[in-house]
């Protein structure tokens, strides 16, 4: 490991963390920005300390998974089990469902306007529809979380508030901090290279730390002798990422994060995962990062497998096995389901046993867990044995801190919503997932940033977005909590 650290180049360091320098409007970033609350009636709940956001890339099929509908297309070997009166589930797809399904609350009435993976995944990450005119100034909503929680950081916090895993491998990679300062971009940890670069948390030698300190000192001296005004916005962005990386690399807690037992890796399904990015590793690292209590409070896990649109983009051979099994970036439901289930069930099981910060509470009690898809899947099977994209209705999952367990919000007939499940006539969208996360963390979702580069106010949750529906209610999904 000493050689790995000593010889780590700038390019390798950026690759390790999956940092996308160039996605922030660093030259025009200000700290702090001018922010106004748009409503005096908003009182954020502030009922969780952390959030784990799981992006299930590709959009797993609701008719087989979280909104099961038996039709003439349905396979006969799914082994359907009853979780509650409104929730049945396939044990063939989710073998460990008993560890998480009874605690989960499902919202089945979601709507998505964009049915293209790149723009829909952008919507998921930005919390708003894609608007090319102001693309560069829009931050990831994880960056907004980091910006808002900055005042709560402690002197001992070295990990950034916003940490993601394998977003670099998604159809829409990390979009950065936009108009916000680059310090809020967060770090995206590349599970395909982090262990190669740093081993498994071993070798905390003085020699290794000395080499790293010497290189950091040289970098600092180079900055000091740079010509006045020579360090621009982009250089400052690199500097901010280097500072994050250096603090993490010199923190003993980072070594512990990477120290994964073979038993844990087996439970999380790592050994069976053939993907470039293994979802079990991402969830294990998310567990350890959260348990380290080193400043990271908003964790994003991207289920990307071999890249592309994601493992669940099943336009063909949804039930394919053997010679008919999908190749490359996709997996059949018989593979993608158990792969996700092994990691997710183990994560929930571990968080429910690990102590939280408050006496008598588990880490799961203090952590809201969301599993989100960019859109749904057509209830009709196509001629290739797959399901195409579907926006009229789909399901997302919520559990953990603050969320009332075992609820089903909204109903569908597979094709359309028959009951939206909340007090508005409009269907909930990813925008409302974002405002729900904001209120849970104690953030006023009605705020807006007024001093933007374009001059257009940036609303934390839009109500009339370009590229989206005519109107979106400004609200969290309160039904998750009451």
Could you describe each region identified by the protein language model?
Residues 1-482:
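Ligand-binding pockets and gating/stacking loops
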């Amino acid at each position: 490991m000493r050689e790995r650290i000593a010889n780590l180049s700038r390019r390798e360091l950026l690759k390790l963390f999956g940092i996308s320098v160039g996605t922030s409007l660093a030259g025009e970033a200000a700290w702090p920005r001018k922010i106004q609350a748009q409503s005096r009636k908003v009182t954020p709940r502030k009922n969780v300390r952390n959030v784990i956001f799981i992006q299930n890339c590709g959009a797993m099929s609701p008719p087989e998974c979280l909104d099961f509908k038996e039709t003439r297309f349905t396979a006969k070997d799914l082994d359907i089990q009853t979780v509650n009166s409104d929730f049945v589930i396939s044990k063939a797809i989710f073998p460990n469902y008993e560890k998480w399904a009874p605690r989960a609350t499902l919202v089945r009435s979601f709507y998505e306007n964009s049915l293209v993976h790149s723009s829909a995944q952008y919507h998921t990450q930005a919390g708003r529809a894609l608007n090319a005119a102001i693309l560069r100034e829009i931050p990831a909503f994880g960056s907004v979380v980091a910006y808002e929680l900055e005042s709560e950081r402690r002197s001992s916090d070295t990990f950034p508030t916003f940490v993601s895993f394998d977003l670099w491998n998604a159809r829409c990679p990390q979009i950065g901090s936009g108009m916000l300062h680059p310090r809020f971009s967060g770090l995206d940890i590349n599970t395909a290279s982090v262990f190669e670069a740093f081993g498994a948390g071993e070798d905390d030698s003085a020699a290794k730390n000395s080499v790293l300190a010497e290189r950091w000192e040289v970098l600092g001296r180079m900055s000091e002798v740079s010509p006045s005004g020579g360090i621009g916005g982009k250089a400052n962005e690199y500097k901010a990422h280097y500072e994050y990386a250096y603090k993490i690399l010199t923190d003993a807690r980072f070594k512990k994060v990477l120290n994964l037992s073979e038993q844990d890796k087996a439970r999380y399904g790592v050994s069976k995962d053939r993907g470039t990015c293994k979802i079990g590793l991402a969830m294990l690292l998310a567990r350890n990062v959260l348990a380290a209590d080193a400043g990271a409070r908003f964790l994003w896990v991207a289920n990307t497998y071999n890249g592309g649109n994601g493992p669940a983009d099943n336009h063909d051979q949804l039930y394919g096995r053997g010679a008919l099994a999908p190749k490359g970036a996709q997996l059949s439901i018989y593979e993608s389901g158990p792969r996700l289930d092994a990691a997710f069930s183990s994560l929930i099981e571990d968080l429910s046993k690990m102590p939280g910060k408050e006496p008598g509470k588990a880490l799961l009690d203090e952590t809201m867990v969301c599993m989100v898809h960019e859109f749904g899947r057509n209830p009709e099977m196509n001629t290739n044995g797959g399901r195409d994209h579907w926006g009229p209705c789909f399901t997302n999952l919520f559990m953990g801190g603050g969320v009332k367990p075992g609820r089903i919000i909204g109903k569908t007939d597979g094709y359309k919503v028959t009951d939206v499940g909340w007090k508005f006539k409009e269907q909930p969208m990813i925008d409302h997932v974002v405002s729900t996360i904001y209120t849970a963390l104690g953030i006023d979702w009605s705020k807006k940033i007024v001093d933007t580069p374009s001059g257009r106010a940036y609303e934390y949750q839009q109500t009339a977005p370009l590229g989206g529906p005519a109107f979106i209610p400004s609200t969290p999904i309160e039904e998750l909590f009451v």
